């Protein structure tokens, strides 16, 4: 706990890992609780949020503070109107999902500091409802799903047997087959891979939907085509990487020497875009999320049930999972096939 040297009687600062220094409003009643609040803040920072969420909350907090400075609001003032204004500002350039993340971060910061903020108050709820209705009219751009046929085309560029090609091929196939988020892919360690007769089991220690770190298991079957088999690609990468404990997917020096440094989440998109470009495809339409979306959409096209798709993607919400398979659904029993590709009619003989 520190005071602002410029205004020692006005502001008390809480140093937190999740948000950095938090300025408490000038309320003497709050200061008697600062030690307890600080302890709570440390506990929340160390246990409550996964690393990717931590980064997202920190970014959200920085943007909220910048907005408050511009508009003359207190970041921890508990002002629902100010938060509503912030959400309205975000609606100009951001998605509803991003706005909800920003709101969750601001609410968490208030809770850590012991300041009441009613996120269901009219100024917040009404803006969110309007935001939701507006984006229902203007659909958001979603990641282009990387379908099986396209993935096979991308894998065709890895003709040379190099450490980088082995790593990148395994990264794409494992990312696709596991339906992991990009942050989850690069968070895997060698120790999280278990070989079994059917294929491999990946142990995901923490994820977006498992903030408490209970862990989840993801199964990947061995394929019949070794060139399009995530298990084979992973085994070939581990052959050159070795089984020394540590990050599964690592950076490489020029020439293929191992660095031991974990890839960053952004590397997933870079590998995918590089492969798309080399395959003559529009690399700009793909993102790291295309692997996850591609598994869900490809499985739906192959006739998989929604519950089985959700088991692999680990979605809790049917509505969110359905977003990924709508592309498959629009082709099911589509009438234009009857009009433009009618079934052949046998000509009568004789």
Q: What is each stretch, according to the model?
A:
Residues 1-350:
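Extended, non-catalytic subsegments within catalytic or DNA/protein-binding/adaptor domains
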């Amino acid at each position: 706990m520190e005071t602002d040297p410029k205004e020692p009687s006005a502001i008390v600062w809480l140093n937190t890992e999740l948000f950095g220094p938090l300025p408490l409003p000038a309320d003497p009643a709050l200061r008697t609780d600062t030690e307890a609040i600080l302890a709570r803040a440390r506990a929340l920072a160390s246990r409550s949020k996964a690393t990717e969420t931590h980064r997202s909350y920190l970014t959200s907090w920085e943007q909220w503070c910048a907005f408050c400075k511009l508009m003359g609001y207190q970041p921890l003032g508990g002002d629902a109107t100010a938060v509503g204004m912030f959400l309205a500002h975000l609606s100009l350039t951001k998605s509803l999902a991003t706005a909800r993340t920003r709101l969750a971060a601001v609410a968490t910061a208030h809770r850590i500091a012991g300041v009441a903020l009613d996120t269901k108050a009219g100024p917040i709820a009404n803006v969110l409802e309007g935001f939701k209705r507006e984006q229902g009219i203007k659909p958001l751009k979603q990641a282009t799903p990387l379908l099986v046929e396209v993935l096979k085309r991308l894998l065709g560029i890895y003709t040379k047997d190099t450490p980088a090609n082995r790593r990148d091929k395994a990264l794409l196939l494992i990312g696709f087959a596991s339906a992991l988020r990009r942050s989850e892919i690069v968070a895997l360690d060698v120790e999280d891979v278990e070989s079994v007769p059917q294929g491999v089991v990946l142990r995901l220690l923490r994820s977006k939907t498992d903030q408490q770190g209970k862990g989840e298991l993801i199964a990947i079957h061995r394929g019949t085509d070794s060139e399009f088999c995530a298990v084979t690609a992973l085994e070939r990468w581990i052959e050159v990487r070795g089984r020394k404990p540590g990050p599964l997917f690592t950076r490489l020096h020029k020439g293929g020497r191992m660095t031991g440094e974990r890839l960053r989440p952004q590397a997933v998109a870079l590998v995918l875009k590089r492969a798309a470009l080399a395959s003559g495809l529009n690399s700009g339409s793909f993102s790291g999320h295309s692997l996850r979306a591609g598994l869900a959409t490809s499985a739906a096209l192959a006739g998989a049930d929604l519950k089985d798709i959700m088991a692999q993607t680990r979605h809790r919400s049917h509505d969110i999972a359905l977003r990924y398979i709508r592309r498959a659904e629009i082709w099911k029993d589509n009438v234009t096939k009857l009009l433009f590709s009618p079934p052949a009619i046998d000509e009568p003989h004789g």
